[in-house]
Amino acid sequence: MKTRGIRNQSWWSGRVFLLGVLVVIAGEWGLTVEGSQAIQLESYAEKEANLKDQARDGLFNRWTFDQQKSDEAPIGFSMLGFGEGPAADWMVKGDREAPSGANLLAVNSSCQATTCYRLIVANGFQYEYPDVSVRMRFPLDAAAGVGGVVFGVRDATHFYAVVVNLAAKTLDISRVVDGKELRLAQAPILPKATPWHTLRIQRNTIISKDFIETFFDGKFVVTAEDQSLAIGQVGLLIRGQNSLHFDNLHAIPLFSQRPLSAPAAY
């Protein structure tokens, strides 16, 4: 019995020591966050509150633009601009070749700067860990087609962007914070030989790590870790001087992936 008591005491002492080490490491990590990510992150209480708010039917959305009139601006969306230059023209257009069957969302930008982002975001919906997909059709001159999706949008100077450059056959993940753009990842893509392409992004989390996964034409492309921005709007973007067509924009919350409590100390 005495030997067993000594062993139990040693076992508990080891666990207490390990817990202390993890607490110290966590504290040091919180003090050494890079300046580029020095934004106040969510507490676990805030994470849980946001999770409960995300589990709402209203966040399961699909926009086909088929119920709107042609040659009008899309209803329920706001336009934002990042970078100098004129605003983009976002317009619903009738097209029998649209994936949804009737209408599509056309955008034309005359902004010549390659760092010129023109956004359109869905009003009234806030996603923290979104799963967003959209169909995209690039112009015949693919050299002029650069665009994609945005999420975590707080305003015109705070958002994440996943951008496809069909001519260069690349996909970029970028972050804009306080108007400063940072590329988080870039990878090549293999577009299918079809007019319409599919872009999908998922923002997910594992314990304390937030990461972004991207897919193009049904294939995984690249992932990036970042947690600078939290909950925000979702939408579409066009970059530089070009035109694009969008259809079948889907957005749902990945709330089932969220942890409800702090990670265990072992």
Set out the residue ranges of the language-model regions.
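N-terminal secretory signal peptides that target proteins for export/translocation
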Residues: M1-W12
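Ligand-recognition surfaces built from glycine- and aromatic
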Residues: L41-N50, S228-Y266
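Short tryptophan-centered beta-strand motifs in secreted/extracellular beta-sheet-rich domains
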Residues: F65, V132-V134, P195-I206, I212-T214
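Short, aromatic/His-centered strand-loop micro-motif at the edge of beta-sheets
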Residues: V177-T198
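Secretory/extracellular carbohydrate-interaction modules
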Residues: N108-D172
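Extracellular carbohydrate-recognition regions
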Residues: Q40-G83, Q257-Y266
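Extracellular glycan-recognition surfaces and repeat-rich motifs
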Residues: K69-A106, C116
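Short, solvent-exposed beta-strand-to-loop segments that form ligand-recognition rims
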Residues: E213-G235
